[in-house]
Amino acid sequence: MRSIVIHGHFYQPPRDDPWTGAIPLEPNAAPFHDWNERIERECYARVAASLASMSFDFGPTLLEWMEQHAPGTYAAVVAAGRAGGAVAMPYHHLILPLSARRDKVTEVRWGIADFRRRFGREPEGMWLPETAVDDDTLDVLAAAGIRFTILAPHQVQRAPEGGLPGWYRTGGGRRIAVFIYDGAISHDVAFGPLVRDAVAWVERLTATPNRLVAVATDGETYGHHHKEGDVVLARVLETLARRDDVRVESFATFLARHQPEEEVRLVAPSSWSCPHGVERWRAECGCRAAPERATQQRWRAPLRAALDWLSGELHAVFERQGRALPPELERQALRMFTSCGWFFDDIAGIESVIVLRSAARAIELAGAEAPRLEAGLLERLALAPSNDPSVGSGRELYLTRVKR
């Protein structure tokens, strides 16, 4: 019998002010207060009833917001996850191949701890932010007890036949299962016609001879990116459930019955959303949200270098003076690497401002070291040019829109 897994990656960047914990009014989310509220109404509340039949992950920071502001939807997500379909995610949405080993370990451990607290069990799988992967990242996952992850077809040199998972053996001698989702079907759900046509979607899923057909998209595809996408998803799941020739299940249940038989080799570093590996989060690789606009992304490398420098300094300060400093310093030092800060087209965008606010808050919490750290950060941000002449560089952006 053919197995089908439909995975949704549900995530929003942390929008809360790192000083107050509250999300400022976001006028472009009207008639809602902010984008979290709007997307919860358009997507999360509507797709919750389908989660029990899916594989899914929710970003821990999104669940933290949902627990406080959408408790009904949160309860439905937790109930579905406890039934077995949920997989974990690192605590923040960092590009792990660009992170130091200690930060990878921290993010994975925090993600597992958050999952355990919410879902009452150990996670078997973990979704990687942007599916960004390298050998060290998978070694950290395997060392933490994670049994599998999910990657795009172009992230392995050769996928096992039949849609089956493969073993990956890390440089550290550990082993982890890797599922490869169907790239063509997933693309046509996320960006093409299938999310509007349940009949065509079911036909595509059942036409392949593969023993496993896995689809993976952003969860916001269903209702937010595509109005009524949640309705089509529900129809697809209901139709498949009535058939006796397919089994709709999770990656974990499939893995319990079918251990990998082949080994896979990574294309690394790589991700699902940048054909240049992970360059979108550290360089002007050509990837941008609005390719029709003639913008530069020369700011990405200086922003990454500035925060890498600050991270090293903050970790050193915390290790020397940890007992005298609040642990919140370390949380903000990780949160400032949220991937959205580099994903879009200009350093003056709200996503980059958010990561710089976390950097500013971490500096503030460093006590007597704060003036030195801020001066060093500003020196490096001066090398990050905005596309907006009225903004100038990252230095001016920090001083006018970030610093308190």
Locations of regions flagged by a protein language model:
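Short, amphipathic alpha-helical segments
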Residues: L98-R109, T131, D135, R196-V199
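Catalytic domains of cell-wall/extracellular-matrix polysaccharide-remodeling enzymes
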Residues: R117-E161, T221-V236
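Short, well-structured secondary-structure segments
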Residues: S3-G8, Q12-R102, T106-E107, E124-L128, ...
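Active-site and substrate-binding clefts of carbohydrate-active enzymes
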Residues: M1-V47, T61, G163-I176, I180-R404
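Short His-Asn-centered micro-motif
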Residues: F56, W127-T131, L151-P153, F179-Y181, ...
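A general structural detector for well-ordered alpha-helical segments in enzyme core domains, enriched
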Residues: T73-A76, E107, G111-D114, T137, ...
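Acidic, His- and aromatic-enriched active-site or binding-groove loops in soluble protein domains
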Residues: T73-A86, R109, R121, A142-A177, ...
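CE4/NodB-like, metal-dependent polysaccharide N-deacetylase domain
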Residues: K104-L128, E203-A216
